[in-house]
C-alpha cells in the first residue's frame, strides 16, 4: 500500500454505485446500533471522531461523479454538526420509510463526506447512513465498533465541531487487491447471455423477477427480529444439518417468497447473495470500504409441499444444497471476482438505463452481515443492531438483510420494491415476514 494516498481513481465497483446515484437509482445502506447510554452530542462527537481518525474512507468523498472515471479524494476536515443529526422522536422503521425515501448523499457539496449519522429513539439508537460507492454492508458494523470504542474512552472536549480527517492513506479499491480480469470463457459467456440471440438464455424457463425497476427507486422496508433463544435453536439446527445460518435463512426466505407469489405450480427462483470479500484480500479485516462479491444460486422448478409438516424436510434439503454450493464458491472465489472484472467491458451508465427497460436480474437478494460480539464488561454496550438497504434493489424485488448481536436478538429487514401502491407493498411485506417467522419457528423447534 502506498505510504500516503490523498486521492485515487475510483474502481469499477465503486463507479457502479456512483452512476446509480447519479441516475436516481439510489444506492445507500444503513446499519444502526442501540446503545446502553444516551447519545448526547457531548459524548457522541468524540466517539464519531474516533471512528473518523481510524478509518480514512470516512474522510473521503467522490469527485467528478459525471466523468467516466470519478476520483476518490480526501477532505481536509469534517464538520460534525453537518453529519450528525438528531431525530430522537423517531423509530428506525418509520425513519427508513419516510426520511430515507429518495434520499441520496450529495455529490455536489465538496465539503461533506458520503455518510451521515442520525440519532433516533430517545437518543439511544445511532443510524449510520452511507453511500454504497465507498462502503459495503460490512463497513456498518466496523463504524459502530469504533464509535463504541470512542464512547468507552475518556471524553475529549471539542472547542469546534470541525475535525481533521484521518492521516492514514486511503485504502486501495477492490480491483487493485485481487485479480478480477475475466477469462475468455467468462467473457464469451457474458456476451452470449446478453446477446438476445435464440437460446442465448439456455433451455431454462424464466425465473420470477418482478417488474422492471422504476426511477427514482422506491421500496417499503419492515424490521423484525427473533429472540436469542430462537437463535440458539437455529445454531443447534445449523450444527445438526451442517449448514450455515445464511443457508437456513436462504431456504426459509425462498419458501416464504414461493408461498407469497406462486400459490402453487413450479417456479424458478434466483437468489443473489452478498459475500464479504475481505476474507480473500490482503488488507486488514477491519478496513472500511466497498469490498463485496456476489454469488447467484438458481433454484429450478421449485414446487414445495403446501403441508406445514413438510416444511422442515424441504428447508433442510434447500439449506444443505445451498450451503454445499456456497462453500464451493467460497473455496475458489475466481468466478465471483470475474463478475467485477466484467464491469470494465461495459458502459455502466448505459447498462443501468437499459436495466430499467426489463425485469430485474434475480428474484431475491440476501445479505447476512454475521454475528458480532462486543466486550461484556464495558461501561457502554451495544444491545441490538439493524441493517437495511432501504432503496429498491436493481438486482431483485425482494431484499432480506440480517445481523446478529451476541447474547442479543437476530435482526432482519425486508425491503420490497414499491411500484406506487405502497399499501399493497406493505401487505406483501407483512405476508412474507409472517411466513418467514412461522417457518423459522417450526423448523428450529426440537432441532
From Swiss-Prot:
It is found in: Membrane. The chain crosses the membrane at residues 28-48, 241-261, 397-417. The keyword Membrane applies. Its main location: membrane. InterPro entries: Alcohol_O-acetyltransferase, Atf2/Sli1-like. GO terms for molecular function: alcohol O-acetyltransferase activity; N-acetyltransferase activity; phosphatidylserine transfer activity. GO terms for biological process: intermembrane phospholipid transfer. It comes from the Eukaryota. Keywords: Membrane, Transmembrane, Transmembrane helix. Coiled coil: none annotated. One of its GO terms (cellular component) is cell division site. The keyword Cytoplasm does not apply. It is a multi-pass membrane protein. This is Uncharacterized protein C18B11.03c. It comes from Schizosaccharomyces pombe (strain 972 / ATCC 24843) (Fission yeast). The lineage of its organism: Eukaryota, Fungi, Dikarya, Ascomycota, Taphrinomycotina.
Amino acid at each position: 500500500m502506498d505510504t500516503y494516498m490523498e486521492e485515487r481513481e475510483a474502481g469499477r465497483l465503486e463507479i457502479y454505485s456512483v452512476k446509480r446515484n447519479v441516475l436516481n437509482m439510489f444506492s445507500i445502506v444503513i446499519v444502526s446500533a442501540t446503545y446502553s447510554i444516551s447519545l448526547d452530542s457531548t459524548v457522541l462527537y468524540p466517539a464519531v471522531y474516533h471512528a473518523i481518525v481510524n478509518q480514512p474512507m470516512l474522510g473521503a468523498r467522490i469527485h467528478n461523479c459525471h466523468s467516466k472515471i470519478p476520483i476518490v479524494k480526501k477532505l481536509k476536515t469534517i464538520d460534525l454538526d453537518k453529519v450528525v443529526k438528531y431525530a430522537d422522536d423517531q423509530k428506525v422503521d418509520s425513519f427508513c420509510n419516510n426520511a430515507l425515501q429518495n434520499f441520496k448523499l450529495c455529490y455536489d457539496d465538496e465539503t461533506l463526506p458520503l455518510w451521515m449519522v442520525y440519532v433516533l429513539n430517545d437518543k439511544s439508537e445511532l443510524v449510520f447512513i452511507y453511500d454504497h460507492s465507498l462502503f459495503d454492508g460490512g463497513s456498518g458494523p466496523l463504524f459502530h465498533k469504533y464509535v463504541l470504542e470512542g464512547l468507552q474512552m475518556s471524553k475529549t472536549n471539542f472547542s469546534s465541531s470541525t475535525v481533521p480527517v484521518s492521516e492514514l492513506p486511503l485504502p486501495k479499491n477492490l480491483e487493485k487487491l485481487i485479480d478480477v480480469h475475466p477469462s475468455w470463457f467468462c467473457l464469451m459467456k457474458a456476451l452470449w447471455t446478453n446477446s438476445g440471440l435464440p437460446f442465448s438464455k439456455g433451455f431454462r424457463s424464466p425465473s420470477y423477477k418482478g417488474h422492471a425497476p422504476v426511477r427514482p427507486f422506491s421500496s417499503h422496508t419492515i424490521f423484525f427480529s427473533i429472540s436469542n433463544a430462537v437463535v440458539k435453536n437455529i445454531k443447534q439446527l445449523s450444527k445438526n444439518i451442517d449448514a450455515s445460518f445464511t443457508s437456513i435463512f436462504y431456504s426459509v426466505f425462498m419458501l416464504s417468497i414461493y408461498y407469497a407469489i406462486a400459490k402453487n405450480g413450479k417456479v424458478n427462483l434466483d437468489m443473489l447473495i452478498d459475500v464479504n470479500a475481505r476474507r480473500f484480500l490482503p488488507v486488514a479485516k477491519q478496513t472500511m470500504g466497498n469490498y463485496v462479491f456476489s454469488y447467484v444460486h438458481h433454484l429450478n422448478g421449485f414446487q414445495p409441499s403446501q403441508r406445514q409438516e413438510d416444511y422442515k424436510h424441504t428447508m433442510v434439503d434447500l439449506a444443505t444444497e445451498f450451503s454445499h454450493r456456497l462453500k464451493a464458491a467460497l473455496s475458489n472465489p475466481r468466478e465471483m471476482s470475474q463478475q467485477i472484472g466484467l464491469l470494465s467491458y461495459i458502459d455502466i451508465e448505459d447498462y443501468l438505463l437499459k436495466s430499467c427497460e426489463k425485469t430485474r436480474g434475480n428474484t431475491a437478494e440476501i445479505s447476512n452481515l454475521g454475528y458480532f460480539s462486543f466486550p461484556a464488561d464495558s461501561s457502554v454496550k451495544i444491545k441490538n443492531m439493524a441493517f437495511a438497504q432501504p432503496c429498491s434493489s436493481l438486482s431483485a424485488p425482494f431484499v432480506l438483510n440480517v445481523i446478529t448481536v451476541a447474547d442479543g436478538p437476530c435482526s432482519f429487514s425486508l425491503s420490497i420494491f414499491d411500484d406506487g401502491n405502497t399499501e399493497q407493498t406493505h401487505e406483501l411485506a407483512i405476508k412474507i415476514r409472517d411466513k418467514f417467522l412461522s417457518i423459522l419457528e417450526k423448523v428450529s423447534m426440537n432441532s
